[in-house]
């Protein structure tokens, strides 16, 4: 297994080396208008260091916090389906494949939708609302499991996982746009730092919470964390 993972990582590194290149230099004969646009100095807001920018930090914290419910699903959905749902390998695999495929499709659709309508902030707030609602529904269904079919609980879990995974590209694009081209790398690095802090903390927080309560409380906590990000994606 670990050998296969090593080969996949090596393949990714090889493709990255092969496909990622610096963009070609601007041709000398480029239109004057294009050169003027390229040479136009950034606005005062975009020239500000992202580390000192409140709006940038709000988006960064929103991204980091909203990743926590996603990590909860990615790291503990299989445990939940096995321990709570008593599903076997085939059922768990089918649920996770459906979740990941749905998330992939929704990420692409979300990016195209917001590119066409220019509504990234509104879309992010809507994503927070839907994600928080879906995890609340999952918590309620889990708490009422004696009266809720297992298939419905699995479907809600898959739906919640898709909803909390669909916003990534939109949020990162909004962050890079807010920071400006000259500071996009810094801003994205800030976001990734917070994201990986959540990736570290979420799996550590869930086991003691689960031991002290139940799965419904775990999913409710995920809903509360998702909902807490709503004001961080407020309109400019």
Residue ranges of model-derived segments:
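Juxtamembrane intracellular "pre-TM" segments in multi-pass secondary transporters
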Residues: 21-60
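Helix-to-loop junctions at the C-terminal end of transmembrane segments
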Residues: 106-119, 210
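Cytoplasmic membrane-interface "Motif A"-like loop-to-helix N-cap segments
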Residues: 115-129
